[in-house]
Amino acid sequence: MSGSVDVVTILWERTSLIPLTQRTIVQASVIGSAAPCKNTLDPGDSYRAAVLCLLGNRFVQVLNLDSGLSGVAVFIRLF
């Protein structure tokens, strides 16, 4: 297989069970590169802003686990 794969995993949390409460990043890990979105993946950053950046830069969300107050999302980008 030629080319490379970038993988971003985000652990997020929200402070309330109210569905529209903003989610914040607890931890993010990157395999490969998250450019140009690396600066949106710090703890405390907005999960929504990170997702919009990733999706706008050819990442595809392949997993979204939502337990209400916390969750995990995985994004991949193929070259």
Which residue stretches match the model-derived regions?
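Terminus-proximal functional modules
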Residues: M1-F79
